[in-house]
UniProtKB/Swiss-Prot annotation:
Pfam families: CLN6. The chain crosses the membrane at residues 57-77, 82-102, 112-132, 178-198, 205-225, 226-246, 261-281. Coiled coil: none annotated. It comes from Canis lupus familiaris. Interacts with CRMP2. Interacts with CLN5. Interacts with CLN5. Interacts with CLN3. It comes from the Eukaryota. It is a multi-pass membrane protein. The gene is CLN6. GO terms for cellular component: early endosome; endoplasmic reticulum; endoplasmic reticulum lumen; endoplasmic reticulum membrane; membrane raft; nucleolus. This is Ceroid-lipofuscinosis neuronal protein 6 homolog.
């Protein structure tokens, strides 16, 4: 009788090993969902965003500049250049900072997608490292970025002609395959992180002064990334996906937190700068020839070799 009474008072204990195997799993998933809803808004990650912007400017934007500034005697053409070492550091530091951003997200994000994206990012950036290293070394031999591979004076007369095919393959790895495997996972990770940057409290949807100041160099760097990387389609798709997500979440009375606003405003500034850049060079006949088609977004280094370095 006492045992029966105890079983009636604690029905869960009576189930013991006979309880449904999925019950605890469903309960855990339900608890995890509740925890995501109840979690507070993350503060602005000033340290991570500052390091992220700084290393982008120094290790990515500054990479080709360092290759031109440092004496050639220090880094012979048959050895890695200072820009190559910058690129190696970028390939290590950037994935690390992206993972730290994901760790600080107040929401549970798809880890498997993040890990596969990071692996693909590192592989694509490493492919680009090799191709970009050779292409920038060709500048010292008279290679002109505003011309196609076959139209370049130092390449078009190579013999046998199959050598030209090899240089075109190198260009393909650098500008197409490397960029695709580098930038697609990069923007995918940023978008996944952005999807977790929403708060139910409108008062928390604001940016501190430091974030506003940091958004300007961040947006300017993404302008360089979009134009030099020739990824305008990928960028505009990501930006409009972010905009659509903001409008969708607004219906649920969810608003961007400071980190989401920082990323969104940085991309908005980038879009404005790209539009101004294209408008400025819209009627350039030489660049128009290199970038035919509907989408015309000249590369900054093509502009440099055409209008700056070619001056007497």
């Amino acid at each position: 009788m006492e045992a029966a009474a105890r079983r009636r008072q604690h029905p869960g204990a009576a189930g013991g090993a006979g309880a449904q195997p999925g019950a605890s799993f469903l309960q855990a998933r339900h608890s995890s969902g509740k925890a995501d809803e109840a979690v507070g808004t993350a503060p602005f990650h000033l340290d991570l965003w500052f390091y992220f912007t700084l290393q982008n400017w120094v290790l990515d934007f500054g990479r080709p500049i360092a290759m031109l500034v440092f004496p050639l005697e220090w880094f012979p053409l048959n050895k890695p250049s200072v820009g190559d070492y910058f690129h190696m550091a970028y390939n290590i530091i950037t994935p690390f900072l992206l993972l730290k951003l994901i760790e600080r997200s107040p929401r549970t994000l798809p880890r498997s997608v993040i890990y596969v994206s990071i692996i693909t990012f590192v592989m694509g950036a490493s492919i680009h490292l090799v191709g970009d290293s050779v292409n920038h070394r060709l500048l010292f031999s008279g290679y002109q970025h505003h011309l196609s591979v076959r139209e370049n004076p130092i390449i078009k007369n190579l013999s046998p002609e199959t050598l030209i095919d090899s240089f075109e393959l190198l260009y393909y790895y650098d500008e197409y395959l490397g960029h695709c495997m580098w930038y697609v996972p990069f923007f995918l990770i940023l978008f996944i992180y952005f999807s977790g940057c929403f708060t139910p409290t409108k008062a928390e949807s604001s940016m501190p002064g430091a974030a506003l100041l940091l958004a300007m160099p961040s947006g300017l760097y993404y302008w360089y990334l979009v134009t030099e990387g020739q990824i305008f389609i990928l960028f505009i798709f990501t930006f409009f996906a972010m905009l659509a997500l903001v409008l969708h979440q607004k219906r649920k009375r969810l608003f961007l937190d400071s980190n989401g606003l920082f990323l969104f405003y940085s991309f908005a500034l980038t879009l404005l700068l790209v539009a101004l850049w294209v408008a400025w060079l819209w009627n350039d006949p030489v660049l128009r020839k290199k970038y035919p088609g509907v989408i015309y977004v000249p590369e900054p280094w093509a502009f440099y070799t055409l209008h700056v370095s070619s001056r007497p």
